[in-house]
Amino acid sequence: MGLVSGEVGSRAWAKREQVLAGARRAFLREGFAATSTDAIAAEAKVSKRTLYSYYPGKEELFADVLRRLTIENPQTQVLASVEEMEPMGLAELREALVVLATKVVSTMMDPDYLALLRTIIADTHRFPQLGEIYRSTVPERGFRVFLNLMERMRDRGTVDVPDAEAATRLFFGPIVTYTLLDGLFKPGEQPHPPAPEKIEHIVDLYMKAIA
C-alpha cells in the first residue's frame, strides 16, 4: 500500500512540475495579462482539468513560478539557507552572509526572474493583485526570515543592531541596486552581477555597521 501511495505521489509531483514548467514558459513569452489558462494548459501539454486540480487560477501559478525562481529555487535554496544559519560568532556570520549575498545576487540577476519582474511592472496597472502576489511571495518572506536571523544574533550578543528591520534593509539594499541598475533597467542585455570580491566588500561594510 505504501509503495502504491508513493508512486501516486511521485506521479502527482511530476505532473505538477510539468504544469509549472509550462506556466513559466508561457508567462515568460506572453507576460501575465496575455497568458490564459488555456495557453498554459497547452504549453504544459495537460488538460485544463488537470491544471485546475493543482492550481485554482493563473495568479496562484504565477506565485509558484516566482517562488521556484527565487526563494525556493532548488539550486540556490536561498530561504532554507537563511533559516538554517546558526553562526557562532562574527567570523562565521561574515562567511555565511557572503554565501547568502552570492546566492541572492545569482537569483535576482537571473534573466528569467528579471523578465518576470518586467511583466509585473507592465501588468500591475491592469492587475493590481500582481504587486501583492510578488511582495508576499518573494521579498516579504525573505525579509522576515533575515530579520529573524538578525534578532537571534542580537539576542546572543553577536551583533549590535537596535533596529533589526533597518539592519535587514541595509543588507539587501546594495544587492537590489545591482538588480535594478545592472539588470532590470537593461532589457536586451545580459545582466551584470557584481564580482565575488565586490560582494565581499559589501558584506565587510555591512559587518562594520552591525558589529
What do the predicted segments below correspond to?
Residues R67-N73:
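Short, basic, alpha-helical segments at the C-terminal edge of helix-turn-helix-like DNA-binding modules
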Residues R154-D204:
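Hydrophobic/aromatic-rich alpha-helical bundle segments in the mid-to-C-terminal region
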Residues F32-A33, L130, V159:
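Conserved hydrophobic residue
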Residues M1-E30, A34-V46, S53-A63:
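Basic, helix-initiating cap at the start of DNA-binding domains
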Residues E95, S106-I121, P128-D155:
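Amphipathic alpha-helical packing segments from all-alpha helical-bundle domains
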Residues Q77-Y113, A167-T168:
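Hydrophobic alpha-helical connector segments
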Residues K15, K58, L69, L97-L100, ...:
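Hydrophobic/aromatic residues within well-ordered alpha-helical segments
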Residues E86-P87, T102-M109, L116-H125, L205-A209:
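Helix-loop "lid/cap" segments that line or gate small-molecule binding pockets
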